[in-house]
Amino acid sequence: MAGLLKESMRIKIYMEGTVNGYHFKCEGEGDGNPFEGTQNMRIRVTEGAPLPFAFDILSPCCAYGSKTFIKHTSGIPDYFKQSFPEGFTWERTTIYEDGGVLTAHQDTSLEGNCLIYKVKVLGTNFPADGPVMKKISGGWEPCTEIVYQDNGVLRGRNVMALKVSGRPPLICHLHSTYRSKKACALTMPGFHFADLRIQMPKKKKDEYFELYEASVARYSDVPEKAT
């Protein structure tokens, strides 16, 4: 791990899928520091622009899907960095409280100083009059994922809040499974939390988007009762 990942790494992302039957493709590039847990991405829609839905539902598949860029504190073993050079995959189902569902599969590999992400998504049942299809969302609130091991893989559970103009936030529930492609056993982390913040500093005409994410893995800050 130490010799493969540097303090500055490049990112390339290739995404395709459908949302409510509408097909699209995106490509992007970026950079970040895996050990500080910060990253930037620049993503362009290459097929299907302008998108007829809010890109916000895809941004967690990009930044929040870029699991190598997490600052692990308190000696928490880093499952994702240990997985190189082979890499890892993840699957995620996001269930929105208005009925929308987004499923995603991502493959992470390493080529030189560049992390390669290949993502496939399927979005269904987003209401025509909802904030996603009306494109009135305004980014994500910060959130926290709970992470735990389960028979050699990592599971993640998270509740995210999508900001909506003039309305309460749209809540969604995320269920993620992370799988290393490395054949040998890894040092598994115990139950912990991963705090994350996704921002979109810039976008153009629903066809170009810039993302920033910061993420920190930690144990609970609440002390146990002394015995």
Swiss-Prot record:
There is a cross-link at A63-G65 (5-imidazolinone (Ala-Gly)). InterPro entries: GFP, GFP-related. Fluorescent proteins have become a useful and ubiquitous tool for making chimeric proteins, where they function as a fluorescent protein tag. Typically they tolerate N- and C-terminal fusion to a broad variety of proteins. They have been expressed in most known cell types and are used as a noninvasive fluorescent marker in living cells and organisms. They enable a wide range of applications where they have functioned as a cell lineage tracer, reporter of gene expression, or as a measure of protein-protein interactions. The keyword Cell membrane does not apply. Pfam families: GFP. The modification 2,3-didehydrotyrosine is found at Y64. The keyword Zinc-finger does not apply. One of its GO terms (biological process) is bioluminescence. Gene3D superfamilies: 3.30.1300.40, Green fluorescent protein. Keywords: Chromophore, Luminescence, Photoprotein. Contains a chromophore consisting of modified amino acid residues. The chromophore is formed by autocatalytic backbone condensation between Xaa-N and Gly-(N+2), and oxidation of Tyr-(N+1) to didehydrotyrosine. Maturation of the chromophore requires nothing other than molecular oxygen. The precise stereochemistry of the tyrosine has not been determined. Non-fluorescent pigment protein that is mauve in color. The wild-type form is non-fluorescent. Homotetramer. Belongs to the GFP family. This is GFP-like non-fluorescent chromoprotein. It comes from Condylactis gigantea (Giant Caribbean anemone).
